[in-house]
Structures are given as C-alpha cells and as structure tokens.
Swiss-Prot record:
Gene3D superfamilies: P-loop containing nucleotide triphosphate hydrolases. The keyword Nucleotide-binding applies. This is Septin-14. Residues 48-313 form the Septin-type G domain. GTP binds at residues 58-65, 113, 194-202, 246, 261. Residues 193-196 are annotated as: G4 motif. The keyword Lipid biosynthesis does not apply. Septins polymerize into heterooligomeric protein complexes that form filaments, and can associate with cellular membranes, actin filaments and microtubules. GTPase activity is required for filament formation. Interacts with ACTN4. Interacts with SEPTIN9. Interacts (via C-terminus) with SEPTIN4. One of its GO terms (cellular component) is perinuclear region of cytoplasm. Keywords: Cell cycle, Cell division, Cell projection, Coiled coil, Cytoplasm, Cytoplasmic vesicle, Cytoskeleton, GTP-binding, Nucleotide-binding. GO terms for biological process: cell division; neuron migration; protein localization to perinuclear region of cytoplasm; spermatid development. Belongs to the TRAFAC class TrmE-Era-EngA-EngB-Septin-like GTPase superfamily. Septin GTPase family. Disulfide bonds: none annotated.
C-alpha cells in the first residue's frame, strides 16, 4: 500500500495572489497511477482517430494533386481539371489513411478554375466563403442545446498550401489579394510550385521578393513553432516559401530508385533530395512536427476570431455599457428584455400600420361604392328613358296597326261593292 503523502507546503513562485496562498504543492511518496494519464490520452486519441484538412489554392495544372500524392506517398485518384471554367469552384475529397495502425481522415479541398478567368477580381471569394462556411457550421454545432462535438466531423481547414507560379519575379496581384483575404481565416504556407523551372540564384531571389511583398502588404503566414529547433530555423533561415517539386514517378539514379522528375536530358530533380528542393522539410514540418499545432492555431486563433466577431454582430459582449463584466445570464436577460421590447414596439407599429391600411381601404371601398352607385343610377335613368321610348314607339305602332286594319276593312268593303255592281251590270245586259 502506498504511503500517505506528506503535507509539506512548497512555496509557489509568484504566488502573491491572496486567492492562491492556500494552494499547496505536495510531493507523493508512492505510486498512485495518474502518471499513466498521457498513455490513456494517447490510447483514446488512437481509438478515436485523427483528422487533418488541407486547402490547396493555385492555378490549374500547377501541381496541387501531384504534391498531395507525393506528401502522403499514395495515389489519391482525382479527375483532371479543365482550363475553361467560367468561375472558380472547390472540390472536396475525404480519404481514410493508415500508417502503423494510426488512422487519419484526410480531407483535401482544391480550387478549380482558379486564375483561369479574364476577370479575376472576385476569384478569391469562393475560397473565403468556404472557410467562413466551415466556421459557421462548427459555431452552429457549438450553440446547439444537445450538441455532439465528439462525433462531429470537423471540416474547418487546418492549413492552406498556397501554390505560387514560378515566374521568378514577384507575386501576382491575385496572389496578394487572395492571401490578404484569407490570412485571418487559415494558416497559410506559401509554396513555389514546379521549382525545378528556376535556377538556384533565381529561386533564392524569388523567395526574397515574395517574403518582402508579403511583409510590405501585411500578410500573415503561418509561423512554425519556435520551441522546435528545426521549425525556428525555417522561420529565420529564408526557407520560406518552400520550393517544392512533386512526383510519383520512380527514376533510377545510379544504383538506386528514387522519386523524381525524368527529362530527356536526365534526372533533374530528386523529390526527396534536400539539395534539389524543400519537399522533405515541408513534409517533416507539416506532418511530423506541426500538424497538431496547425489544428490548435485553427481553433484557438482563427476560429475564435470568427466566433468573437460573429457573436458581437449578434449583440453579445463580455462587458456591459459601463465596462463591467457581464455574465451570460445577465446578457441573456438583457437580450430577452430588448427582444421583448422590440417585439412590442414592432407589434404596435404593425397594429398602427394595419389600422391605417384598413382606414385607407375603407375610404377606397367607399369611393368605389359611391362611384358604382352613381354609375348604377345613371344606367337606371338611361334604362327608364329607353323604356319610355320603347313604350311610345309601341303605342305608335299599335295606332298604325289599327289604322291599317280600318283601311283594310274599307278597302275590302269597297272592293266587294265594286264586284256587286259589275255583276249587276252583267245581269242587265243579258
């Protein structure tokens, strides 16, 4: 059985705070088991699995898919993109990878049609919208009453690999505009794609020009951990941006097979030769050293910035009008009262508007009714006049009919008299 720990107090440096005076640091005299907490955490993490989300931004055909395949040494099947897209789009693919029983869910988001349009003014907007959409989805999950963040598939982008065209001179305006728009939303690692197209002197000059332009435009790129010697060396040795070459083709160099690019005049680039390109440094720093830090930076810096701005737009704040700290309950009650008052005000305004519209409609209906009544009276008078006219015409027609029958009777009588006289004359002649 473990011995009972001593109650000896050990002074804590900088413990002038009165609330910390009663906290004592005790040293145990036996084994209790909580030293296995790191092992428990590792086992739980392995059982749950890891995830990593990469955003690749670059022009069509610059080598985004090839570099991702080279980074993970696998063939992630992708369809080739066309240069004739009318607008910029994004493709999202998720893969399940396994390395020495360590599972990794890899999500690769790539731009499609980026930089192919004549008008490139809004080419960066789909990228910004996608980053904000992932932050918003995570925020909505956080704000749920019954949330399940443990099972939630976090789609927030952890790193943006920005592929720079190897012009050898300077960054394009689109590059500066895009990186300036997303540097507060994602960790940016700039890459010079197809670096084998530049000589060493031109490549170093190009790197210096790129970093100078990034600094002069206030663009923030990812800073590797300073507590790691290799990372600190990258930040200060001028390796950024990384000059990379991707290839899954194995070529023979001497007596060994290496991944490289084979040209008619020979093997110009060995992908994993640090004298040829920075691919190995990029892979080690991205996957072996800083993957977890990239995820932490995404959550603690970029997401928190988005969350803070979003909640402030919704009216939430940590302090009141008098700069006094306000609890969430107080903020909720204040918001509820404000919303209730606003609802009452809007309800009263709606009632007044409704009554005003009712009065206007009533006046409109009265005017329409009066107009219809006048029209009815006018038509009624016209009808009566027409009836009188018809009655007069009928009377005249009846008189004419009577006169006609009288004339007919007189005519028949005269005709009969004539016939009688003619008959008498015939009889006398006989």
């Amino acid at each position: 059985m473990a011995e009972k720990p001593t109650n000896t107090s050990v002074p804590i440096p900088g413990s002038e705070d009165p609330q910390k005076e009663n906290i004592r640091c005790l040293s145990t005299l036996g084994h209790f088991g909580f030293e296995c907490l790191p092992t428990q955490l590792v086992n739980k993490s392995i059982q749950k699995g890891f995830s990593f989300n990469i955003l690749c931004v670059g022009e069509t055909g610059i080598g985004k898919t090839t570099l991702i395949n080279t980074l993970f040494n696998t063939n992630l099947k992708e369809t080739k993109s066309s240069h004739f897209y009318s607008k910029v789009g994004l493709t999202v693919k998720t893969y399940e990878l396994l390395e020495r029983n360590i599972p990794l869910r890899l999500t690769v988001v790539k731009t499609v049609g980026y930089g192919d349009q004549i008008n490139k003014e809004a080419s960066y907007q789909p990228v910004v919208d996608y980053l904000d959409a992932q932050f918003e989805a995570y925020l909505q999950e956080e704000l749920k009453i019954k949330r399940s963040l443990a099972d939630y598939h976090d789609s927030r982008i952890h790193v943006c690999l920005y592929f720079i065209t190897p012009t050898g001179h300077s960054l394009k305006s689109l590059d500066l505009l895009t990186m300036k728009s997303i540097d507060r939303r994602v960790n940016i690692i700039p890459l010079i794609a197809k670096a084998d197209s530049l000589s060493k002197n031109d490549l170093q000059r190009f790197k210096n020009n790129i970093m100078s332009e990034l600094n002069s435009n206030g663009i923030q790129i990812y800073q590797f951990q300073v507590d790691d010697e290799a990372s600190a060396q990258v930040n200060s040795s001028g390796l950024l941006p990384f000059a990379v070459v991707g290839s899954m083709e194995e070529v023979k160099v001497g007596k060994r097979m290496v991944r490289g690019r084979h040209y008619p005049w020979g093997v110009l680039q060995e992908v994993e030769n640090e004298n040829h390109c920075d691919f190995v440094k990029l892979r080690d720093l991205l996957l072996s050293t800083n993957m977890e830090d990239l995820k932490d930076q995404t959550h603690t810096q970029h997401y928190e910035c988005y969350r803070s701005n979003r909640l402030q737009k919704l009216g939430f704040s940590d302090t009141g009008p008098d700069n006094r700290p306000v609890s969430f309950q107080e903020m909720y009650e204040a918001k509820r009262r404000e919303f209730h008052n606003q609802c009452q005000k809007e309800e009263e305004e709606l009632k007044q508007t409704f009554m005003q519209r009712v009065k206007e409609k009533e006046l409109t209906f009265k005017d329409a009714e009066k107009e219809l009544q006048d029209k009815f009276e006018h038509l009624k008078r016209i009808q009566q006049e027409e009836i009188l006219k018809l009655e007069e015409e009928r009377r005249k027609l009846e008189e004419q009919i009577i006169d006609f029958y009288k004339m007919k009777a007189a005519s028949e009588s005269a005709q009969a008299q004539v016939c009688t006289n003619i008959k008498k004359d015939k009889d006398r002649k006989k």
